[in-house]
């Protein structure tokens, strides 16, 4: 476009697209509508990828996990007000889990919104977003688009990663500027996530504590997986001989079948250890805040490696805090521990005996006949376990209560950043969004193991998966209920609040053009899984399991408050 003086012009749409591209963003996930529909169209016209979802929350979850896998911000695009609010849930999820993400939302006109005159989808979105992310920006001028996007990228990935909100008022897109000036304004931040080198005395203190430990363990969190310094972490573990425990999304950072893995005896390892080395893991509710019977009677000493200084001492005193990026910290710690004796053989031997015993028990459960003759979690997930061991490049998405807990315990992972689950909040609804992003980012097949209740939060995105013909196989653990499917009704004519229809989810997939299967036995599940993944097409396996399978609230039943007085 040119003006009367023959100066070539560009507009807000094009400058925003150019700014995103300059910052290596080539994919967006979102839901189109006023005022951003044409932005999505023009993004596609420019040759970039746009995955159009049925609900903004799931588009946001896709962006969040894309950020985790790739180590750069995943980008979600939404409409204003209600659509923006749907996206904020996933923005908060990204921030809580330390995933780099940028939420871009169109918004109504500032001069009307600020006077609360009732504009279309009126909302002060920038300030609504602020408590739920690392930073919240609004771009009012076309000239500020390049610096606004660059700041969002740097903020999302620097230090502890997280979500960033960028507000895009509708009038911004129609503003114009000369192409020459726009090109001068475009830039990419230099070294947006610089190494943060830990202090020498912090490394020395941590090394001394580890050298003097009698029963050390290493706890690997998803922060360690995000750091993508897999070889350094593996070398630290193997050079020290210290047993390790992976949190859910750290499974596969070292293979779950590694001889130093103590995952099969986690409770014993935590209760008996005297020093715990936390690498990219937080002492939050997932680790019982470092206290209680989980951690035994003996006072523990902690080494904690984290890029955020105020994470230290958040629940327990940290004897050796190491503030810095994980790659730098682990590298320096290896040097400080060079030549030190390996972990005590009596301690590692005791753990190995426990691991071997527990693995034998689990193997028996995976092959045992059930009293009802129906599948349960053990024998059905045993099929998934064997398949994943033979196909370690597949991404495994997992959510639910019992479906989450049992899959994490039973299905071994051999490669990093392949297990994608509910994360720090234990949130339901991440499933189908994660599937879309994992397939888009890796270009490889994805398997999702879903509780039937959890699947309900994002099930309509089956249409999205089919529309883009993604190689996703969804397995629904169908016991017909939240937790269980056989809770008695409280009274005649009143359906239990935990009951679900034991439905034909396979037919949902077929309604959108995918392939559906019903599996009633492990053999049927195995055959369906092999055929589905080999097809490279969208597939869903309706795995019918015993309604009595499962326990209320999975392994966190203690968090479910019960009445002290009972029924009146």
Swiss-Prot record:
It comes from Oxalobacter formigenes. Thiamine diphosphate binds at residues 377, 401-403, 426-428, 453-454, 483. Homotetramer; dimer of dimers. InterPro entries: DHS-like_NAD/FAD-binding_dom, HACL1-like, Oxalyl-CoA_decarboxylase, THDP-binding, Thiamin_PyroP_enz_cen_dom, Thiamin_PyroP_enz_TPP-bd_dom, TPP_enzyme_TPP-bd. This is Oxalyl-CoA decarboxylase. The N-terminus is blocked. Keywords: Decarboxylase, Lyase, Magnesium, Metal-binding, Nucleotide-binding, Thiamine pyrophosphate. Pfam families: TPP_enzyme_C, TPP_enzyme_M, TPP_enzyme_N. One of its GO terms (biological process) is fatty acid alpha-oxidation. PANTHER family: 2-HYDROXYACYL-COA LYASE, 2-HYDROXYACYL-COA LYASE 1. Involved in the catabolism of oxalate and in the adapatation to low pH via the induction of the oxalate-dependent acid tolerance response (ATR). Essential enzyme for the bacterium survival, as it relies on oxalic acid as its sole source of energy. Catalyzes the decarboxylation of oxalyl-CoA to yield carbon dioxide and formyl-CoA. It catalyses: oxalyl-CoA + H(+) = formyl-CoA + CO2. Its EC number is 4.1.1.8. The lineage of its organism: Bacteria, Pseudomonadati, Pseudomonadota, Betaproteobacteria, Burkholderiales. SUPFAM superfamilies: DHS-like NAD/FAD-binding domain (SSF52467), Thiamin diphosphate-binding fold (THDP-binding) (SSF52518). Pathway: Metabolic intermediate degradation; oxalate degradation; CO(2) and formate from oxalate: step 2/2. Its cofactor is a metal cation; thiamine diphosphate. Changing residue 555 to A: 3-fold reduction in the affinity binding for oxalyl-CoA, but it does not affect the catalytic efficiency. Binds 1 metal ion per subunit.
């Amino acid at each position: 476009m040119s003006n009367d003086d023959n100066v070539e012009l560009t507009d807000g749409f094009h400058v925003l697209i150019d700014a995103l591209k300059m910052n290596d963003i080539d994919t967006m996930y979102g839901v189109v509508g006023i005022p951003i529909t044409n932005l999505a169209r023009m993004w596609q016209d420019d040759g970039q990828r746009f995955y159009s979802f049925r609900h903004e929350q799931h588009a946001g979850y896709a962006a969040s996990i894309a950020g985790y896998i790739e180590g750069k911000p995943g980008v979600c695009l939404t409409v204003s007000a209600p659509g923006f609010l749907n996206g904020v849930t996933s923005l908060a999820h990204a921030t809580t889990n330390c995933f780099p993400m940028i939420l871009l939302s169109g918004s109504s006109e500032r001069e009307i919104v600020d006077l609360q005159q009732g504009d279309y989808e009126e909302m002060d979105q920038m300030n609504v977003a602020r408590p739920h992310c690392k930073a919240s920006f609004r771009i009012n001028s076309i000239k500020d688009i390049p610096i606004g996007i660059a700041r969002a990228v740097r903020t999302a990935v620097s230090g502890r990663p997280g979500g960033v909100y960028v507000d895009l008022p509708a009038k911004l897109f129609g503003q114009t500027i000369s192409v020459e000036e726009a090109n001068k304004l475009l830039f990419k931040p230099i070294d947006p996530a610089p190494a943060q080198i830990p202090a020498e005395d912090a490394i020395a203190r941590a090394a001394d504590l580890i050298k003097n430990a009698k029963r050390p363990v290493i706890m690997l969190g998803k922060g360690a997986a995000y750091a993508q310094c897999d070889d350094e972490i593996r070398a630290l573990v193997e050079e020290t001989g210290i047993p390790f425990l992976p949190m859910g999304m750290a499974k596969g950072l070292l293979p779950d079948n590694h001889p130093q893995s103590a995952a099969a005896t986690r409770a014993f390892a935590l209760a008996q250890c005297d020093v715990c080395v936390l690498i990219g893991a937080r002492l939050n509710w997932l680790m019982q805040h470092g206290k209680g019977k989980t951690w035994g009677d003996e006072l523990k000493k902690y080494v904690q490696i984290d890029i955020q200084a105020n994470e230290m001492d958040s629940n327990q005193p940290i004897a050796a805090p190491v503030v810095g990026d994980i790659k730098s910290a682990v590298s320096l710690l290896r040097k400080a521990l060079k030549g030190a004796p390996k972990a005590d053989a009596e301690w590692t031997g005791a753990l190995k005996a426990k691991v071997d015993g527990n693995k034998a028990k689990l193997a028996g459960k995976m092959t045992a006949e059930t009293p009802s003759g129906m599948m349960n979690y053990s024998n059905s997930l045993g099929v998934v376990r064997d398949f994943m061991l033979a196909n370690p490049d597949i991404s495994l998405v997992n959510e639910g209560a019992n479906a989450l807990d049992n899959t994490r315990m039973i299905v071994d992972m051999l490669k990093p950043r392949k297990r994608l689950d509910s994360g720090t909040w234990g949130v339901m609804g991440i499933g189908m969004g994660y599937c879309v992003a994992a397939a888009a980012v890796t270009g490889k097949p994805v398997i999702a193991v879903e509780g039937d209740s959890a699947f309900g939060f994002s099930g309509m995105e089956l249409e999205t998966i089919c529309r883009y013909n993604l190689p996703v196989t969804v397995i629904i653990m169908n016991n017909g209920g939240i937790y269980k499917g056989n809770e008695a009704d409280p009274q005649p004519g009143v359906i239990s609040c935990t009951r679900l229809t034991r439905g034909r989810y396979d037919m949902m997939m077929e309604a959108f053009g995918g392939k559906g299967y019903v599996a009633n036995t492990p053999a049927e599940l195995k055959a369906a899984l092999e055929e589905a993944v080999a097809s490279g097409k969208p597939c869903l396996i309706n795995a019918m399991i015993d309604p009595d399978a499962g326990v209320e609230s999975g392994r966190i039943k203690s968090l479910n408050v019960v009445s002290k007085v009972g029924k009146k």
